Amino acid sequence: MKIIADTHAHTLASGHAYSTIKEMAAAAKAKGLKALALTEHAPEMPGTCGLFYFQNLDVVPREADGVRLLMGAEVNIMDPDGMIDLPEKTCMDLDIVVASIHPPCYGLDHTPEENIRAYVEVMKKPYVNIIGHPDDGRFPFDYEILVKTAKETGTLLEINNSSMRPQSSRKGTRENILTMLDLCRQYEV
């Protein structure tokens, strides 16, 4: 498989990454990527971009170092009803929207039923393109429902390499990723 795009990347603007857009575009080019999605964390994540950042992305060039730049956001799923932390209009103006559960924004005390409801509700939003790192065992849920809903809504499910790092705070990721991939194969997702 030849990877041609990175659809979930953070710059210095997200507060926990270390590269500029220019540096990331150069690295993407060196890896042979054709496109790079800049998906900074949305406002409820501590230390990241405010709303104005996302509303002002039209001033950023759409190409750097021969790599197409997609303007996006990694929105935070805030509750079991699928509420996110960017307005619909802002999301509709972006090229790509990744929706993820992060502990600072979504409590660890939700039930598996609430967790899958959060994912299902957010996948119903027409501007959500990808579910980010749905592999964290701290937020258990039914992967079969996730995969079936992704197929119904045309939402991509991310395999996030950061989840597999030994120092990752996410739990049970390898097993969860394998379960998700098996179900994707079974349901032809």
Residue ranges and their predicted role:
Residues 20-24, 118, 179:
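Well-ordered alpha-helical segments embedded in enzymatic catalytic cores
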Residues 15-18, 48-51, 140-149, 167-183:
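Histidine/acidic-residue-rich catalytic or RNA/ligand-binding cores of hydrolases
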